[in-house]
């Protein structure tokens, strides 16, 4: 993550990271240089697939005045009486604009019931994620030993090409998502 952050920041661009699968329990991208972290809350954060939602976490570390692609942060917003987000909110300009202008224009407000359900899920996230990870590792190891399986992708496996990176960024576990292929392809699955 920090290599991407270095390149992005050298070019005065923010680094956005989708942290839906590992969740904040297993990976904290801001600690590695990400400026904005995104989550689909209807996955692990929710915990019971009862509500749709998303989450933006702004680190407050990015200087939006230096970004050549985000000039709207530095220009007057006529829909808010000429408000200039970078002048009023500094490094929190992005999240302020997302809350004020984007939420108003697109309607990204979660219903109270969905917010309640999300909160219930978040309360147990730290308990559920280790179990998701250990279960996924067990399934990945089983699939790896199955003669009908051509390949298995799961960064928790020691022989996975991303295992070292997963250990660095997600030392407490990766996630519960596994991908694999059947020998013989789609014709064998019918």
PLM regions: where:
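Conserved PLP-enzyme active-site core in the AAT-like
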Residues: 1-145, 153
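Conserved C-terminal alpha-helix-loop-beta "cap" of PLP-dependent enzymes
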Residues: 129, 144, 148-190
């Amino acid at each position: 993550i920090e290599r991407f952050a270095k390149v992005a920041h050298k070019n005065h661009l923010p680094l956005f990271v989708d942290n839906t699968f590992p969740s904040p329990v297993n990976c904290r991208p801001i600690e590695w240089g990400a400026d904005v972290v995104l989550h689909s809350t209807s996955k692990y954060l929710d915990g019971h697939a009862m509500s749709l939602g998303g989450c933006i976490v702004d680190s407050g570390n990015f200087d939006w005045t230096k970004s050549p692609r985000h000039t709207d942060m530095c220009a007057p917003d006529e829909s808010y009486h000429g408000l200039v987000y970078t002048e009023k909110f500094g490094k929190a300009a992005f999240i302020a604009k997302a809350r004020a202008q984007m939420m108003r224009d697109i309607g990204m407000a979660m219903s109270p019931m969905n917010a309640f359900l999300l909160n219930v899920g978040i309360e147990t996230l730290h308990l559920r994620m280790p179990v998701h990870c250990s279960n996924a590792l067990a399934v990945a190891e089983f699939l790896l030993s199955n003669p009908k399986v051509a390949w298995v992708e799961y960064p928790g496996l020691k022989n996975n090409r991303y295992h070292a990176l997963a250990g660095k960024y997600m030392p407490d576990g990766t996630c519960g998502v596994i991908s694999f292929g059947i020998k013989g392809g789609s014709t064998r699955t019918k």
